[in-house]
């Protein structure tokens, strides 16, 4: 199958590498013309995922039309902020009918829409829209270390058709029609990872980390259920699986944001040092707004938002959470 990958960050590049190494032709495209030239010349993404050479089956395209030609699937792996404009480009290039998966995680700022909802809004006639989510770090996938993820769409027939096509010896895919649950799990776990990074940075220990992960899962489940998701989805790869990885893994950008804030650094400084997008930061406010809309209590999210707004110190965030009224779990 020919697969088009839009977005050449670390995750987009890792997916392009992976699928091109497992029987697919892949075209990789990004808006950044300088990055395209660099990748074409070096046959490697030295900016986004250095150290991994591109196979012959991976083509880096300067022209999106070339990248979309004969494509059977489009993966949009931009930041959530770039998702809508990428979907609009598909329409512009006459490719709005192609099957498309959002492989980014978060809520769109200002609209509060989940990734698949953005795609449905831009491409209302497309019946093959979904998300790819789950516990997966780009570096590990590029090294061909095993992982398992979830492909979710409201179109069950398409999921049943696509999952076997994309399954490999390295990446095992599970299908789901609970696209809301899969998308919410992927989005909100980034917020919880900042909280656990904060706790770890303050050296509050493993007990505190376990408490934050567990109560974070409770927050995610409450919100997802209110939005129409199946609670059991949060017990799977797209829920607790992704949450554990992002909250504990050394490669987690969002956890590193929390670690940096615990050191007393300004948020902008932390983001510059990380050098990549942290979807958790841009998601916090939209998650809180959505929780308010559905009247869902999300204390971890709320206190983190106050931290980002400089209304609290890192220490006060943890103190506030510990001082909450006693209740049954």
From Swiss-Prot:
Places the protein is found: Cytoplasm
Principal localisation: cytoplasm
SUPFAM superfamilies for this protein: 6-phosphogluconate dehydrogenase C-terminal domain-like, NAD(P)-binding Rossmann-fold domains
Pfam families hit by this protein: NAD_Gly3P_dh_C (PF07479), NAD_Gly3P_dh_N (PF01210)
Chain positions recorded as sn-glycerol 3-phosphate binding sites: 105, 134, 136, 189, 242, 252-254
Keywords for the protein's UniProt record, in alphabetical order: Cytoplasm, Lipid biosynthesis, Lipid metabolism, NAD, NADP, Nucleotide-binding, Oxidoreductase, Phospholipid biosynthesis, Phospholipid metabolism
UniProt-recorded Gene Ontology molecular function terms: glycerol-3-phosphate dehydrogenase [NAD(P)+] activity; NAD binding
Active site: 189 (proton acceptor)
Catalytic activity: sn-glycerol 3-phosphate + NAD(+) = dihydroxyacetone phosphate + NADH + H(+); sn-glycerol 3-phosphate + NADP(+) = dihydroxyacetone phosphate + NADPH + H(+)
Positions annotated to bind NADPH: 10-11, 31, 105, 138, 253, 277, 279
Pathway: Membrane lipid metabolism; glycerophospholipid metabolism
InterPro entries in the record: 6-PGluconate_DH-like_C_sf, 6PGD_dom2, G3P_DH_NAD-dep, G3P_DH_NAD-dep_C, G3P_DH_NAD-dep_N, NAD(P)-bd_dom_sf
Enzyme Commission code: 1.1.1.94
One GO term (biological process): glycerophospholipid metabolic process
One CC-aspect GO term: cytosol
Xref: PANTHER family: GLYCEROL-3-PHOSPHATE DEHYDROGENASE (PTHR11728), GLYCEROL-3-PHOSPHATE DEHYDROGENASE [NAD(+)] 2, CHLOROPLASTIC (PTHR11728:SF1)
Record's function text: Catalyzes the reduction of the glycolytic intermediate dihydroxyacetone phosphate (DHAP) to sn-glycerol 3-phosphate (G3P), the key precursor for phospholipid synthesis.
Family designation: Belongs to the NAD-dependent glycerol-3-phosphate dehydrogenase family.
UniProt name for this protein: Glycerol-3-phosphate dehydrogenase [NAD(P)+]
Upper taxonomic lineage: Bacteria, Pseudomonadati, Pseudomonadota, Betaproteobacteria, Neisseriales
Gene that encodes it: gpsA
């Amino acid at each position: 199958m020919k697969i088009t990958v839009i977005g050449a960050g670390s995750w987009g590049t890792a997916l392009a590498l992976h699928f091109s190494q497992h029987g697919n032709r892949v075209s990789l495209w990004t808006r950044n013309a300088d990055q395209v030239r660099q990748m074409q010349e070096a046959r490697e993404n030295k900016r986004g995922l250095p150290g991994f050479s591109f196979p012959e089956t991976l083509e880096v395209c300067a022209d999106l039309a070339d990248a979309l030609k004969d494509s059977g699937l489009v993966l949009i792996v931009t930041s959530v902020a770039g998702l809508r404009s990428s979907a609009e480009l598909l329409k512009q290039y006459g490719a709005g009918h192609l099957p498309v998966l959002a492989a980014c995680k978060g809520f769109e700022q200002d609209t509060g829409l989940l990734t698949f909802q953005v795609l449905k809004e831009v491409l209302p006639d497309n019946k093959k829209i979904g998300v790819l989510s789950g516990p997966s770090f780009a570096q590990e996938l590029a090294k061909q270390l095993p992982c398992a993820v979830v492909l979710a769409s409201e179109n069950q027939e398409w999921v049943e058709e696509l999952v076997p096509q994309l399954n490999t010896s390295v990446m095992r895919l599970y299908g789901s029609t609970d696209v809301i649950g899969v998308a919410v799990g992927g989005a909100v776990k980034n917020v919880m990872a900042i909280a656990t990074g904060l706790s770890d940075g303050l050296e509050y220990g493993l007990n505190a980390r376990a408490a934050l992960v567990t109560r974070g899962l409770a927050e995610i489940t409450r919100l997802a259920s209110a939005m129409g998701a199946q609670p059991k989805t949060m017990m799977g790869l797209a829920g607790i699986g992704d949450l554990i990885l992002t909250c504990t893994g050394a490669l987690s950008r969002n956890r590193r944001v929390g670690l940096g804030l615990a050191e007393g650094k300004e948020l902008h400084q932390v983001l510059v040092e990380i050098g990549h997008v942290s979807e958790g930061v841009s998601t916090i406010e939209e998650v809180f707004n959505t929780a308010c809309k559905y009247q869902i209590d999300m204390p971890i999210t709320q206190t983190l938002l106050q931290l980002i707004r400089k209304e609290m110190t890192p220490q006060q965030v943890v103190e506030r959470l510990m001082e909450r009224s006693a209740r049954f779990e």
